Amino acid sequence: MTILVIAEHNNAVLAAATLNTVAAAKAIGGDIHVLVAGSGCGAIGEAAAQIEGVAKVLVADDAAYANQLPENVAPLIADLAKSYSHVLAAATTNGKNFLPRVAAQLDVDQISEIIAVESADTFKRPIYAGNAIATVQSSAAIKVITVRATGFDAVNATGGSAAVEQISGTGDAGKSAFVGEELAKSDRPELTAAKIVVSGGRGMQNGENFKHLYSLADKLGAAVGASRAAVDAGFVPNDMQVGQTGKIVAPQLYIAVGISGAIQHLAGMKDSKVIVAINKDEEAPIFQVADYGLVGDLFEIVPELEKLV
């Protein structure tokens, strides 16, 4: 039994989610190979070779994979998948873009966002916004699976010595073209990788008031997130959204400010190690999952908290 893990990267840095995906592969058992598809991605291949538990790294260095267009990457994965029992990718934007296409090309079902491995063919995944856990069993010859990174502790990024093999790509499918992107730059940690996250909700009242959270976050070395209500109200951009339809986070510390705790939001942060809730409504659902709760005016509590940090 050999498992293919799709590396998550940007041609410069190997994403931490890859380490969680390898952990899921180790739980399944068998040899683990990692595919690095990109352009000028040799350094990523070397980094992947250092991951604990990886036996081989396949590097497909081709301009067609520079921007991770799924129309180009998915055929490569599908072609390689025929030699593997399982294909795993992190449940990121890329992973969710690649693997449904791969599953369709292989004519198998895809299993989404697993959080635990029961056996080589049986997995657990959240349903109903995380309120229930489904145990699913696959009879497919090749199991195509996305992995929720927060469900598995990352393996060590060093300690391995896997062989690195250069492979030929499948080229440009000619079905799409990369036009451009606008990346928001921030000195704060990336939301899904941060050890501390400070999130604001509708209780912030407007986008200007998020300055209180930015100030606190900078003192804590934290990332800043938001509830869907805050995003829908136009307070902050949607790349800050935490929740079922946003980003799934599980930091060491999650501070929810002015967030009532809608089920969709809880699905995205309830696995955080320590949850602190600040809300004026003592009946807010967020307090049901919080380890510590502060009931009061956030515009008084947050500045006071910042002074104490």
Question: Can you describe what each PLM-predicted range is?
Answer:
Residues M1-V309:
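N-terminal glycine-rich FAD/FM-binding segment characteristic of electron-transfer flavoproteins
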